[in-house]
């Protein structure tokens, strides 16, 4: 284990007010120390490293120039917020990042007054910033609002909706576009720095405001002609006419790692801007840490690693991951059916669709951070006879719910939805938990909703979805590795709406939806040891339900427990609705539904989260004993 870095200048900075006492010439050294501190911290916790390394100078410059927290600073997504946390009173806890009871990996309002708006999903910062800017105007305060958004997040339509609205309102909003895709090289040299200072200066911006007032008296046609002439002329020097057309004053691109560029521009904008301003800053993801700079993903998300070598800790898996099983099964099916296509929203590696892209590049589409578009794009393909697999994380599918309802479900289009990261996801906390997909999909008429109990079942569900053309179909599976079951050479086509009994008993029935099946089987061992004969069943389907299986379990057992890693309103609620409507609760059946608790569960390891929720072996056994008014047997495994 390496020792924490020496940081004499950073040791003087606890809050931004301390930072503002430093001279400009001290800031490059401070940036080096912040990088060293962040690298050491993330090497111990894992997390999102590359994005934060790329915005160290920008973060320091913003806090140096603006009066945070009175001035509002909003980070989009939040992957880049680690330097911000170090500089805003949280350095003493930075080595608890993404750990149980530790700092969040994202900005959170409840964590600090320096986090005025929480983030984790993309493209929200400009909308939130605009709301805050308008609030400041209504209150007649001189509060500035700064939204920092990456070029990736700018691929989502919500960002442009907000830009368009901000321009129309002529709001006092500062948007900083952090361009770390390296598609545009940052300008270098004294002339580019001079032009950026000139464009952001009082004279130029004041002349622009004067021009706006003058042309207001000359009629709309002359106004438009003059405005276009000025902005197009300026565009030859600085670019950015698209943002100008939306009503933003555009500055840049400027070097996001040069304080000589950043500080004068930010100060000019602070002192002179009256309407919306967009500052285009070019940065390098992974800046200042050679292993990150050399890596293809710039160390976007990393495990714990060795600071000297950059080598990440790797735990040898006991079984293949669910994501890899899905990807291999989809490639296998795609090789046999040229109508199968894959769609991902900027997550080809995370969803495994990079494997499909390697095998069939013309049949795999990365649409960017645009889940709404992804779903309707898939609907269009389905309408033309293709078999689209729109692979999305559960938490991101939420962003496209209207498209799922209006464009897919109502039209009965056979779009396939592989739903990754279902259930608890651990260190990313409540913003990324896959909690609600079963509940919001199972309410839709004609929608088939499946959950894989293990990796072999997942393979069956991939083939089942490929073969199903009667309407939309989904299948959910968690993050992480499978349970190590024997794998079929190819998946089987499952009968729609039919579950399976895995273990037969007579007194207690445990009905699992998804990967909680393994804990149900373990719990059954403890229940059997306590003299309670236990049936364990795998529902497979939340919609359509297996009515025959439900009737059998309800009529021949004293107690029925449904278990799912999802919210209330999901599988258990569907079961309860059916049993009550059929009168199967009238004869004294004891029934319990185990779901995620109705709270936003904080980050922890998934197994700890399941234990807290009562969804593990011990929680299931405890639920049975409480319902049957029996004490917990000595020796029951936890």
UniProtKB/Swiss-Prot annotation:
Protein's pathway: Metabolic intermediate biosynthesis; 1-deoxy-D-xylulose 5-phosphate biosynthesis; 1-deoxy-D-xylulose 5-phosphate from D-glyceraldehyde 3-phosphate and pyruvate: step 1/1
Q: What is this protein called?
A: 1-deoxy-D-xylulose-5-phosphate synthase
Q: Which Gene3D superfamilies match?
A: 3.40.50.920, 3.40.50.970
Family assignment?
A: Belongs to the transketolase family. DXPS subfamily.
The entry's function note states: Catalyzes the acyloin condensation reaction between C atoms 2 and 3 of pyruvate and glyceraldehyde 3-phosphate to yield 1-deoxy-D-xylulose-5-phosphate (DXP).
Disulfide bridge partners, by residue number: none
The cofactor note reads: Binds 1 Mg(2+) ion per subunit. Binds 1 thiamine pyrophosphate per subunit.
- Source organism per entry reads Rhizobium etli (strain ATCC 51251 / DSM 11541 / JCM 21823 / NBRC 15573 / CFN 42)
Q: Which PROSITE patterns match?
A: TRANSKETOLASE_1, TRANSKETOLASE_2
Upper classification of the source organism reads: Bacteria, Pseudomonadati, Pseudomonadota, Alphaproteobacteria, Hyphomicrobiales
Electron transport found in the keyword field: no
Matching Pfam families: DXP_synthase_N (PF13292), Transket_pyr (PF02779), Transketolase_C (PF02780)
Q: Which cofactor does it need?
A: Mg(2+); thiamine diphosphate
Record field: catalytic activity: D-glyceraldehyde 3-phosphate + pyruvate + H(+) = 1-deoxy-D-xylulose 5-phosphate + CO2
Tell me the Gene Ontology biological-process terms attached to this UniProt entry: 1-deoxy-D-xylulose 5-phosphate biosynthetic process; glyceraldehyde-3-phosphate metabolic process; terpenoid biosynthetic process; thiamine biosynthetic process
Q: Which GO terms describe its molecular function?
A: 1-deoxy-D-xylulose-5-phosphate synthase activity; magnesium ion binding; thiamine pyrophosphate binding
The residues listed in the UniProt record as binding thiamine diphosphate, with positions renumbered to this chain, are: 79, 120-122, 152-153, 180, 289, 371
Residues engaged in binding Mg(2+): 151, 180
């Amino acid at each position: 284990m390496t020792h924490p870095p020496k940081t004499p200048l950073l040791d003087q900075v606890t809050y931004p007010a301390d930072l503002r006492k430093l001279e400009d010439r001290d800031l490059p050294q401070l940036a080096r120390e912040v990088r060293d501190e962040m690298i050491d911290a993330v090497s111990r916790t894992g997390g999102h490293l590359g994005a934060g390394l790329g915005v160290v100078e920008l973060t320091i410059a913003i806090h140096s120039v603006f009066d945070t927290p009175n001035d509002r600073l909003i980070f989009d997504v939040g992957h880049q917020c680690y330097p911000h946390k170090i500089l805003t009173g949280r350095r003493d806890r930075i080595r608890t990042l993404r750990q149980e009871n530790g700092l969040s990996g994202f900005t959170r309002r409840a964590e600090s007054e320096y986090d005025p708006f929480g983030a984790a999903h993309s493209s929200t910062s400009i909308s939130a910033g605009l709301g805050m800017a308008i609030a400041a105007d209504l209150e007649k305060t001189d509060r500035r609002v700064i939204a920092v958004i990456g070029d990736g997040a700018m691929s989502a339509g919500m960002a442009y909706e907000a830009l368009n609205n901000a321009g129309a309102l002529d709001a006092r909003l500062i948007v900083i576009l952090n361009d770390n895709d390296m598609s545009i090289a940052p300008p270098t040299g004294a002339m580019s720095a001079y032009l950026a200072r000139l464009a952001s200066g009082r004279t130029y911006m004041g002349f622009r405001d004067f021009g706006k007032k003058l042309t207001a008296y000359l009629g709309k046609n002359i106004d438009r002609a003059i405005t276009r002439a000025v902005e197009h002329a300026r565009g030859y020097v600085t670019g950015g006419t698209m943002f100008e057309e939306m009503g933003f004053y555009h500055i840049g691109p400027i070097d996001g790692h040069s304080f000589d560029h950043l500080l004068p521009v930010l100060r000019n904008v602070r002192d002179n801007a009256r309407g919306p301003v967009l500052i285009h800053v070019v940065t390098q993801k992974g800046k200042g840490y050679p292993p990150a700079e050399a890596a293809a993903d710039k160390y976007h998300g990393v495990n714990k690693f060795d600071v000297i070598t950059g080598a990440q800790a790797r735990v040898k898996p006991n079984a293949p991951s669910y994501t890899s099983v899905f990807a291999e099964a989809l490639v296998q099916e795609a090789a046999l059916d040229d109508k199968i296509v894959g769609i991902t929203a900027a997550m080809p590696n995370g969803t495994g669709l990079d494997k499909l892209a390697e095998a069939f590049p013309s049949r795999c589409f990365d649409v960017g951070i645009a889940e709404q578009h992804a779903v309707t794009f898939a609907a269009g393909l389905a309408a033309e006879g293709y078999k689209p697999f729109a692979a999305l994380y559960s938490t991101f599918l939420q962003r496209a719910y209207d498209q799922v309802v209006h464009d897919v479900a109502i039209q009965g289009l056979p779009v396939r939805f592989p739903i990754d990261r279902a259930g608890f996801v651990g260190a990313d906390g409540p913003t990324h938990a896959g909690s609600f997909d079963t509940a919001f999909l199972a309410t839709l008429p004609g929608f088939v909703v499946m959950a894989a109990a293990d990796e072999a079942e997942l393979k069956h569900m991939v083939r089942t979805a490929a073969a199903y053309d009667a309407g939309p179909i989904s299948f959910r599976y968690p993050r992480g590795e499978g349970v190590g079951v024997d794998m079929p050479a190819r998946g089987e086509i499952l009968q729609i709406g039919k579950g399976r009994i895995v273990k037969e008993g007579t007194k207690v029935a445990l009905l699992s939806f998804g990967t909680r099946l393994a804990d149900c089987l373990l719990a059954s061992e403890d229940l059997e040891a306590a003299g309670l004969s236990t049936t364990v069943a795998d529902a497979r389907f939340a919609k359509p339900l297996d009515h025959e299986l439900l009737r059998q379990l309800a009529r021949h057992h004293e107690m029925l427990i449904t278990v799912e890693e999802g919210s209330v309103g999901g599988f258990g609620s569907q079961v309860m609705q059916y049993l009550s409507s059929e009168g199967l609760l009238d004869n004294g059946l004891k029934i319990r539904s185990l779901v995620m608790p109705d709270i936003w569960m904080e980050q922890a390891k998934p197994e700890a989260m399941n234990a807290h929720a009562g969804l593990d072996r011990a929680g299931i056994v405890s639920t049975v004993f409480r319902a049957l008014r029996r004490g917990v047997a000595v020796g029951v495994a936890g």
